[in-house]
Swiss-Prot record:
Family classification: Belongs to the TyeA family.
Lineage, highest ranks first: Bacteria, Pseudomonadati, Pseudomonadota, Gammaproteobacteria, Enterobacterales
Pfam families with a match to the protein in the record: TyeA
Protein name: Protein TyeA
Self-association state and partner proteins as the record states: Interacts with the translocator YopD and with residues 242-293 of YopN.
Signal peptide: none
InterPro entries noted in UniProt: T3SS_TyeA (IPR015144), T3SS_TyeA-rel (IPR013351), TyeA_sf (IPR038347)
Length: 92
C-alpha cells in the first residue's frame, strides 16, 4: 500500500510531538514517498522546513524544540545537496 496523506499528516504530528527529532526522522518522510532523486529530496526538505516554520509557536513545547526541528530539516537539505553534487560529479 502506498504512503498516503493521512499517514504523512500522522507522521508530521508525531514529529512535532517528539522532543528531540533527529535527521533520520526527517529522512523517514522522504523515504516513505520514495522520492527518486536528490534534487527532488532537496525541494521536499525545503518545503518541509518552510511548513514547520509556518506552524504557530504554540504547536511546539518550546522554542528550542522548534529550532531543533528546523535544524534537522536544514541538515537533511545539506545532505541531499551533497548527494546531488556527488551524483553530478560522477557524470563528469
Amino acid at each position: 500500500m502506498a504512503y498516503d496523506l493521512s499517514e504523512f499528516m500522522g507522521d508530521i504530528v508525531a514529529l512535532v510531538d517528539k522532543r528531540w527529532a533527529g535527521i533520520h526522522d526527517i529522512e523517514h518522510l522522504a523515504n516513505a514517498f520514495s522520492l527518486p532523486t536528490p534534487e527532488i529530496k532537496v525541494r521536499f526538505y525545503q518545503d518541509l522546513k518552510r511548513m514547520f516554520r509556518l506552524f504557530p509557536l504554540g504547536v511546539f513545547s518550546d522554542e528550542e524544540q522548534r529550532q531543533n526541528l528546523l535544524q534537522m530539516c536544514q541538515n537533511a537539505i545539506d545532505m541531499a545537496i551533497e548527494s546531488e553534487e556527488e551524483e553530478l560529479s560522477e557524470l563528469d
